[in-house]
A protein has these predicted regions:
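Terminal amphipathic alpha-helical/low-complexity segments used for targeting or macromolecular assembly
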Residues: 1-122, 127-128, 295
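Left-handed beta-helix
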Residues: 16, 21-22, 26-27, 32-33, ...
């Protein structure tokens, strides 16, 4: 069978110029020009993998699941456990009740049980996946219909793509210890570490994020997020914007919007909330802690 590698351009399936070790390959795949190797992976049907350096599963892979991150309180002990079925309601619940030790342990126990139940024994690439011009994929689960083009590194990630709502990972992106939900796109040099990206989100144009969560239909470009809880429909479009230690939803960040979670000399221990529908104007600076009402 021939594989369509780009619109109107077909190549016959097969394996050419590639080193594979302990790999299961599905039907009608085209794998060629693998610079280093593919090691210990499961590959589905009708995949196109070309000009990729390394695809590998190593010992201790988590695929981004069970990772505890500190959202809002950057210096905290961790209040959200990231896993593939996380949603904004559960994440907010974990943050709100992080001081309730018994409840926190119960939630973590339930999530750990789910992670153990659903964790694959090695990295896998689903069916109808396209991976081209990519440097490194390690300990990652890439589900059906995903397209990865020109990425630099995916490490300990789960990409929850499906054929009806595919995920696109674009050029120069680095994604580590993170989960990306269906319909999302991570493009143009975006950098994610210890993050959860919900459905139909776009992170692009060099946006960098660490220990943050983004939920449905959020758009982030150029700026930076750290320990941020970005609920549905948040938008930030400017290079000079920093979202740190804040809880947002239906929020629009103006250019040069900045937040400070260092009050006095105690370190980054402060945080605040902008309730739904908030908008910050250009040059806004907020010193946490604060709570700002809706709209």
């Amino acid at each position: 069978k021939s594989i369509e590698i780009t619109k109107g351009f077909f190549c016959h399936s097969g394996i050419d110029d590639a080193t594979l070790r302990n790999v299961t390959v599905g039907n009608d795949c085209l794998i060629k020009h693998i610079g280093n190797y593919i090691n210990d992976y499961t590959i589905g049907d009708e995949c196109y993998i070309a000009n990729v350096a390394t695809v590998e599963t190593t010992e201790g892979a988590s695929y981004g699941n069970g990772n505890v991150i500190s959202v809002l309180d950057e210096a905290g002990n961790g209040n959200i456990m990231v896993f593939r079925d996380l949603n904004s309601q559960l994440a907010a619940f974990m943050v709100r009740h992080s001081d309730d030790t018994d409840l926190r342990h119960a939630i973590i126990r339930l999530i750990n049980e789910e992670v153990v139940r659903t964790q694959p024994d090695r990295g896998c690439i689903g069916s109808n996946v396209k991976i081209v011009n990519t440097v490194e994929i390690v300990n990652s689960v890439i589900e059906d219909g995903c397209e990865i083009s020109g990425a630099t590194r995916l490490s300990d990630c789960t990409i929850k793509s499906n054929r009806n709502s595919s995920v696109f990972i674009g050029s120069n992106t680095i994604i580590e210890n993170s989960i990306v939900a269906d319909g999302s796109s991570i493009t143009d040099g975006a950098r994610l570490q210890d993050c959860f990206v919900g459905e139909a989100c776009q992170l692009t144009s060099g946006f960098t994020a660490s220990q943050s969560v983004f939920f449905a239909n959020t758009f982030m470009s150029n700026g930076e997020a750290c320990a941020a809880f970005c609920g549905p429909f948040c938008a930030s479009h400017h290079k000079s914007s920093l979202l740190i230690g804040g809880e947002y939803s239906f929020y629009n960040a103006g250019s040069a919007t900045n937040f400070s979670n260092h009050a006095y000399k105690m370190g980054p221990i402060h945080w605040g909330t902008l309730e739904r529908g908030s908008k910050t104007a250009s040059g806004t600076h907020l010193l946490w802690p604060a709570q700002i009402g809706a709209f």
